[in-house]
Every structure is written in C-alpha cells, then in structure tokens.
UniProtKB/Swiss-Prot annotation:
UniProt entry keywords in alphabetical sequence: Lyase, Metal-binding
A Pfam family of this chain: RraA-like
Lyase as UniProt keyword: yes
Family: Belongs to the class II aldolase/RraA-like family.
The protein's name: Putative 4-hydroxy-4-methyl-2-oxoglutarate aldolase
Cofactors, names only: a divalent metal cation
GO biological process, alphabetically ordered: regulation of RNA metabolic process
NCBIfam families registered for this protein in UniProt: NOT-MenG (TIGR01935), PRK09372.1 (NF006875)
Subunit structure: Homotrimer.
Record's catalysed reaction(s): 4-hydroxy-4-methyl-2-oxoglutarate = 2 pyruvate; oxaloacetate + H(+) = pyruvate + CO2
Length: 160
C-alpha cells in the first residue's frame, strides 16, 4: 500500500500533543529525504541476516523499522542491502543502529534514517524477531501503522 509522504510538522500540528514523534535525532542517509508507508519491524542486535531477508521480499511502499538496540558498534545496513530494499519497492528504512557505505546510500532512491555510521560488518546468524512491536525514541512502532519521515523527524500514526 503506497502512502503519500506528508510533512511531519503538519502532522504534529494536526494530531496535537498526543502525537507519536520519535525523540531520537536520527540522520538522513538515503537519497530520498521524505518517505512514508506501512510499518514492518525487525528487532536484531548487531546481526543483519533477518532484515536482509525481509528486504528481499516485495516492500509495496512499506517502511522497515529496525530496532538494533541503539548499537553503532556494527552496521546493520550498507549499500548492498539498501539497494535490495530499493529494488524490491520499500520506501524507506528507520534504523535504531548504524549504517555503512554512507556516500553510496545518498545515491539510492530510498529513504534511510539511522543513528550514525560504522564500517564494521554485522554478524549474519539470523538472530532477531520479525513483526514485533518495537519501541525507541519514545515511540511505539507497531506493524501495520504508518510511518512518516522527513528532515524534521519521524511521526507514526495508527492505520485507519
């Protein structure tokens, strides 16, 4: 289901004080600064095999929210995995963790927000959980809800 991106500041103004706005100061890494879509989640720690598997599936304009427990010790996404997501129709990635290949990520037509960078590879054992409710930055990310992201931040709204 494709969702049209909307300015997060406008969403905050419309929703009011109960808005679900992520407090983490994430950085933009992808070539698309505005993105939106239904949420799919992955919880993993310094291991990206599961998220690579998810991005291998049709994204249908969705947003993959990855809770890497805030670790920047290893990168969960690099150019190969980001391109996999782009080519399979994902609109964006929100990563509570690190990425690598930052200069190449900027050239890809996919939104990518993450805490920072680290050139170190993650492990590939497949540890992790898919489609669990995850929480970071003061926001609960529930699969199926809608994430909106732009230069101002990330807002999550309940799907209608």
């Amino acid at each position: 289901m494709a969702v049209t991106p909307r300015p997060t500041a406008d969403l905050v103004d419309e929703i009011g004080p109960e808005v679900r706005s992520c407090d983490l100061q994430m950085r933009q890494f992808g070539g698309r600064s505005e993105f939106a879509g239904p949420i799919t989640t992955v919880r993993c720690f310094e291991d990206n095999a599961l998220l690579k598997s998810v991005l291998s599936e049709p994204g249908d304009g969705g947003v993959l929210v990855v809770d890497g427990d805030g670790s920047v010790h290893t990168a969960l996404v690099g150019d190969v995995i980001a391109e996999l997501g782009r080519s399979n129709g994902w609109s964006g990635l929100i990563i509570n963790g690190a990425v690598r290949d930052a200069s190449t990520l900027r050239t890809l037509d996919i939104g990518i927000k993450a805490l920072g960078t680290n050139p170190r590879k993650s492990s590939k054992t497949g540890d992790g959980v898919r489609d669990a409710v995850v929480e970071f930055g003061g926001v609960v990310f529930t699969p199926g809800d809608i994430a909106y992201s732009d230069d101002d931040g990330i807002v999550v709204v309940t799907a209608d």
